[in-house]
Amino acid sequence: MLDREGFRPNVGIILLNAHNEVFWGKRLREHSWQFPQGGIKYGETPMQAMYRELHEETGLLPEHVKIIGRTRDWLRYEVPDKFIKREVRGHYRGQKQIWFLLRMVGRDCDICLRATDHPEFDAWRWNEYWVPLDAVIEFKRDVYQLALTELSRFLRRPAQRTDKSRGPRAPRYPRVANGHAASEAPAAIDTSAVCSEVEPGANALDETPPRVSLRD
């Protein structure tokens, strides 16, 4: 479903933990990382689409999260032609998104990346609030900036972005392995079937994006 200008209605999700860190997912069998997002189906409200996408991409249910805020208006980004599948070129321009800020009230082990037969992510991690601006693919960066900035006013303690000239920063908490502090972050893992106190690690971030179809 596209609007008259060729933008697909979509929702984006910024999921916070208790430390104001954000959920960051690695796309299935790819090296690109992003926030959960997905299209709004015909007849759905943005909130209904958000809860559906949240479950499809993270396995979380409404009782696992609390809505903190949402963007006032649609935020748009255009997708470069080289990333658009041939069959939709000339019709599809990009996404227009309503962004939701959620607070996770469940546990890390409630996250299940295999909640559906068509998972979007194969690994995940918690990142500091502003880190995605330095890591997301360039054509989404302006929308991420707008969404993160607008929604930061809802945080318990406003997240201040620092070191703007520097690249992606490590998570605020060190990753642990076998109960001991690790000297390096371990490879990203899927904690879908595990409930423990060990936080997921992360791979090096890669900005190589997938080609976009209308289901993204």
Curated annotation (Swiss-Prot):
Q: What is its EC number?
A: 3.6.1.-
Concerning PROSITE patterns, the annotation shows:
NUDIX, NUDIX_BOX
Q: Name the protein family.
A: Belongs to the Nudix hydrolase family. RppH subfamily.
UniProt domain Nudix hydrolase: residue ranges:
6-149
Q: Which GO terms describe its molecular function?
A: pyrophosphatase activity
- The short sequence motif called Nudix box sits at 38-59
| Gene3D superfamilies, per database record | Nucleoside Triphosphate Pyrophosphohydrolase
Give positions of region: Disordered. 159-188
Originating organism:
Burkholderia mallei (strain ATCC 23344)
- Source organism superkingdom: Bacteria
The free-text function statement in the UniProt record for this protein reads: Accelerates the degradation of transcripts by removing pyrophosphate from the 5'-end of triphosphorylated RNA, leading to a more labile monophosphorylated state that can stimulate subsequent ribonuclease cleavage.
Keyword field contains Magnesium: no
* Keyword Ribosomal protein carried by entry: no
Q: Which NCBIfam families match?
A: PRK00714.1-2 (NF001935), PRK00714.1-4 (NF001937), PRK00714.1-5 (NF001938)
What cofactor is this protein dependent on?
A: a divalent metal cation
Listed Pfam families: NUDIX (PF00293)
Its EC top class is hydrolase
Name of the protein described by the UniProt record: RNA pyrophosphohydrolase
Q: Which UniProt keywords apply?
A: Hydrolase
